Amino acid sequence: MKKDGKECLVGGPWLMALPLTGGGCYPNHNANTPIFNDLCTEWTVSSTEARTEGEDVCITVQGSYKEFKGNYTLRINASGEIAVSYTFEALQDVNPRQWGLVFEAPASFDRTFWRRDGLWTVYPEDHISRPVGEAALFYTGLPETIHPRVKPSWAWSRDFNELGSNDFRSTRRNIWYAGLKNEDGNTVTAVSEGHQHWRSWLQQDRIRFLVADFVTPGDEMFLSSYYAPYRKPLKTGESIGGTVKLVVGESNTTQE
């Protein structure tokens, strides 16, 4: 999708229903943990329908993944606003860590910004959970290799892997808005009401972002009973869904 002739969205929507994974508590001193960030697989379209409703264009797509079947509808207007409503039925049992829709932006959209409902009233300025902020895909001035016996002189939030800095790729829960922007001030913004969640990362030569309707903590075995009320295991035949609202254009959000 282009805004004033400039690409802002180049892919999606794709369904993500990332399974909750865990295991025994074993020592592992290898920092090269494999990335687990998969979309649903084997998408096949069964039908498409395009229509106009007033000044809006609506496109409904029916299809199936290996893991889910269902549909989504895109409603697009001339102001650069997109609403994507989706509903999918599970084709197999899954205990999800996160589920929602994933979109893709050009690599130049390498800063993320957000406003969200925080759990606490005060956060350190460089904390990944701060309620209002902006984060870079990668921060400058960091060494490529780090010695385990040397104390870092920078915040942990600036550490990075191939997906980006910790600050850029962390999940922001309960957003009012969150988005990406490039150096020219062009933005892609997810607008919510404090109940959806945002995560962005580098995917090869593009930036991807997830707008999630469900997130839960990781599979930490010692806290399994505490986290149990926050899990939502899905049985075959159960459905997930939601509506993602995106605004494409120049930045008009303020961070107070």
Enumerate the predicted regions with their spans:
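Beta-strand/loop-rich accessory regions of lumenal/periplasmic or secreted enzymes
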Residues: 1-256
